[in-house]
């Protein structure tokens, strides 16, 4: 039996609260069960030097965890004077995932920074960050349209992410911390709303997995992401 009695293909309750803060062009509090992440999207005119004069925009991301988002307090990375490897890996993943959702040429020379701050961690913080940041990004892009800076919203479609894994020999979707820490195989999958894969991060933590198990996990992820995208669209319709 999984925590909270979920079936193996069932994601945790997902909540997306838009306009959570007042200053950012897009802001969303995303909740995957007890995992809570504040995602904001901020717009700046101009692009990084390597893109100047090319007539296209850029999307970047930063990720961080509050000191007591976990069971025991972790010192802020700013206090340590440098970001950890995990942090850099996750923020690059978020940025790659969301760049796939936008027509950067149609965006023009604007930079959008996605800030994902974990308030409470119970597994799946990177997948929740991508899911929430996507909704914040839609709202930020719409502000550019409303302000007359873009003619149409350059969003190509929704992007969402979910974790899957093998726990106690069974393939499961959207792992909580207790499952994640005991998983034989742990995988994060990012997809477009029509099921195309943007990224797969998979590791055999305890036991190597087969090709057949990989296909099962990807199918499980697709089903979970379809459910999450429906929640994203419902949030945007409100």
Curated annotation (Swiss-Prot):
Any matching Pfam family: RNase_PH
CC cofactor: Mg(2+)
Record note on disruption phenotype: A single deletion in rich medium makes filamentous cells with little DNA. No growth defect in minimal medium. Does not grow at 45 degrees Celsius.
Assigned keywords, A-Z: Nucleotidyltransferase, RNA-binding, rRNA processing, Transferase, tRNA processing, tRNA-binding
Catalyzed reactions per annotation: tRNA(n+1) + phosphate = tRNA(n) + a ribonucleoside 5'-diphosphate
pH dependence, record text: Optimum pH is 8-9 for degradation.
Family annotation (InterPro entries): ExoRNase_PH_dom1, ExoRNase_PH_dom2, ExoRNase_PH_dom2_sf, PNPase/RNase_PH_dom_sf, Ribosomal_Su5_D2-typ_SF, RNase_PH, RNase_PH_bac-type, RNase_PH_CS
Thermal dependence of catalysis: Optimum temperature is 40 degrees Celsius activity drops off quickly from 45 degrees Celsius.
GO MF assignments: 3'-5'-RNA exonuclease activity; tRNA binding; tRNA nucleotidyltransferase activity
Physiological role: Phosphorolytic exoribonuclease that plays an important role in tRNA 3'-end maturation; has no activity on a tRNA precursor with a 3'-terminal phosphate group. In vitro is freely reversible, adds nucleotides to the ends of RNA molecules by using nucleoside diphosphates as substrates, but this may not be physiologically important. Probably plays a role in initiation of 16S rRNA degradation (leading to ribosome degradation) during starvation.
Subunit note: Homodimer. Has a tendency to aggregate into multimers.
NCBIfam families registered for this protein in UniProt: RNasePH
Misc remark: The gene in K12 strains MG1655 and W3110 (and also other derivatives of K12 W1485) has a frameshift mutation that leads to loss of activity, although the protein may be translated. Thus in those strains rph is an expressed catalytically inactive protein. Strains shown in this entry are derivatives of K12 MC1000 or MC4100, in which the frameshift has not occured and thus are active.
Protein name: Ribonuclease PH
Organism: Escherichia coli (strain K12 / MC4100 / BW2952)
Organismal lineage: Bacteria, Pseudomonadati, Pseudomonadota, Gammaproteobacteria, Enterobacterales
Gene: rph
